[in-house]
């Protein structure tokens, strides 16, 4: 399924914990625009570009808080090669591959406003770099060409909806991650992975104020780093996040979470996004009528990289009308996008909660402090949006972003094809389990005594990328 309409997104600070069969790994996240003044126009333009850059094959960007003043880019420092060298990459659950700008690359970005220097990966400087041939098993995941010659490389060509492109070849080298060795303690551990070595970027990928060294995809396909680690038995295809929209932090984990426990609902099979079956929706007990197409085709997408929540127009109108019946306020439109109002008392006491019920009777409740955000003192806006999202078959869909998922531990279990969640204090910690059965605490603020890694995921637009990814064999 390929989504056509562009939307908005906001993402925030988080920590990544990657659990392998014998180890767990962590990254520290940091927000780009922390403390800066809210700017809805900037937020909207970021959202639009974000949507354009999400790969068409799959979609689920990472997330953080749902505050408009947090809009920006989130990145992580990873280490590649031997000896390991640091690179700043966008972390994207909406795409499949890890790719890095490589030498030579005359069109790669040379500067960024993110307070770090951009770096080009140099195969000649790494003793463990190896080219991936077109006859390699990895290349067979993405290329159906019958004209492969063993001496040729396995190359990729990505075209994004905003017409940005990335071209390069796949190579195999060491990825160094931070292994969790105990409660709030880590140490480095290397794993061999295949990633793209980008030699030609254009459009927003080749310039821009928020340029990074590459993109790290956490998608469902066999080409993602997560799938590569799972194929060798080094990790399970399970990842989780806990997003704190109060303090702007949280946890992102790849691997088994021991606690808190979550209730799960099945993923809709054979989808390019993280789709679930929404069975019902109510405003403090008052049921809303769901479009029949939504229930029939499982057209509800869970996307932590999207900050807001988007509904078909008829459902959106019913939602807002029912909320206002409980608490009448005078709405006005801000920047042609957001419905806002003045309010001086506690919103949780005045406005009703909104609940979603999914297959297997799994419920998710969103409170007023989650679905309302402040632009300035006593000026609130709804995070609900009339999205107008449709599939290629013109079926309407619902997109549930971070404002629905914040302050909850959300688990995506690709092995068992379920998604689950539980209310949780995302500024505290979670328990993760390693392959030996050991259980360790990992927190958002004090993960380890080892150097912490910065993490980032582009918090811009919503949905899945309208993109075409083509792979060919190049000399």
Swiss-Prot record:
Q: What is its EC number?
A: 3.4.23.-
Write out the catalytic residues in the record: 92, 303
The GO annotation for biological process reads: pollen tube growth; pollen tube guidance; protein catabolic process; proteolysis
Annotated Gene Ontology cellular component terms:
cytoplasm; cytosol; plasma membrane; pollen tube; side of membrane
Indicate the principal place this protein occupies in or around the cell. membrane
Keyword set for this entry?
Answer: Aspartyl protease, Cell membrane, Cytoplasm, Glycoprotein, GPI-anchor, Hydrolase, Lipoprotein, Membrane, Protease, Signal
Peptidase A1 domain: residues covered: 74-422
Task: List localization entries.
Answer: Cell membrane; Cytoplasm, Cytosol
Q: Which family does it belong to?
A: Belongs to the peptidase A1 family.
State the function annotated in the UniProt record. Displays aspartic proteolytic activity. Together with A36, contributes to pollen and ovule development, including the apical cell wall constitution of the growing pollen tubes.
This chain belongs to the protein called Aspartic proteinase 39
Biological source species: Arabidopsis thaliana
């Amino acid at each position: 399924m390929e989504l056509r309409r562009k939307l908005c997104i906001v993402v925030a600070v988080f920590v990544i914990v990657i659990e392998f069969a014998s180890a767990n790994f962590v990254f520290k996240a940091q927000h780009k625009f922390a403390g800066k003044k809210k700017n809805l126009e900037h937020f909207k333009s970021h959202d639009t570009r974000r949507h354009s850059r999400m790969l068409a094959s799959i979609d689920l960007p990472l997330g953080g808080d749902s505050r408009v003043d947090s809009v920006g880019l989130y990145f992580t420092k990873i280490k590649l090669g031997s000896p390991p060298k640091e690179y700043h990459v966008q972390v994207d659950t909406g795409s499949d591959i890890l790719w890095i700008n490589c030498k030579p690359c005359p069109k790669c970005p040379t500067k960024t406003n993110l307070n770090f220097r951009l770096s080009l990966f140099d195969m000649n400087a790494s003793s463990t770099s190896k080219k991936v041939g077109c006859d390699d098993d990895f290349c067979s995941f993405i290329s159906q060409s019958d004209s492969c010659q063993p001496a040729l490389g396995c190359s990729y060509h990505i075209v994004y909806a905003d017409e940005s492109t990335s071209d390069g070849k796949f190579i195999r080298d060491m990825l160094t991650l931070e292994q969790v060795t105990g409660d709030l303690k880590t140490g480095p551990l290397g794993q061999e992975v295949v990633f793209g070595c980008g030699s030609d970027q254009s459009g927003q990928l080749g310039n821009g104020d928020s340029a990074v060294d590459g993109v790290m995809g956490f998608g469902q396909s066999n080409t993602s780093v997560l799938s590569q680690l799972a194929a060798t038995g080094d990790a399970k295809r399970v990842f989780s996040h806990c997003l704190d929209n109060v303090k702007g932090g949280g946890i992102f984990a790849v691997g088994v979470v021991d606690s808190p426990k979550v209730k799960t609902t099945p993923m809709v099979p054979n989808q390019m996004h993280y789709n679930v079956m929404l069975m019902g929706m109510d405003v403090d007990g008052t049921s809303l009528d769901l479009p029949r197409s939504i229930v029939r085709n499982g057209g509800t997408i869970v996307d932590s990289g999207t900050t807001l929540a988007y509904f078909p127009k008829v459902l959106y109108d019913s939602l807002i009308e029912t909320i206002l019946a409980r608490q009448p306020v005078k709405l006005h439109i801000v920047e042609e996008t957001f419905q806002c109002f003045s309010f001086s008392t506690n919103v949780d006491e005045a406005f009703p909660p909104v609940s979603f019920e999914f297959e297997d009777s799994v419920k998710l409740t969103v409170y007023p402090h989650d679905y309302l955000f402040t632009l300035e003192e006593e000026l609130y806006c709804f995070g609900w949006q009339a999205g107008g999202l449709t599939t290629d078959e013109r079926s309407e869909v619902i997109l549930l972003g971070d404002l629905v998922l914040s302050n909850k531990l959300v688990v995506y279990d690709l092995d068992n094809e379920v998604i689950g969640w539980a209310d949780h204090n995302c500024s505290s910690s979670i328990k993760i389990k390693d392959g030996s059965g050991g259980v360790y605490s990992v927190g958002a603020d004090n993960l380890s005594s080892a150097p912490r890694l910065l993490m980032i995921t582009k918090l811009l637009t919503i949905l899945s990328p309208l993109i075409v990814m083509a792979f060919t064999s190049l000399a």
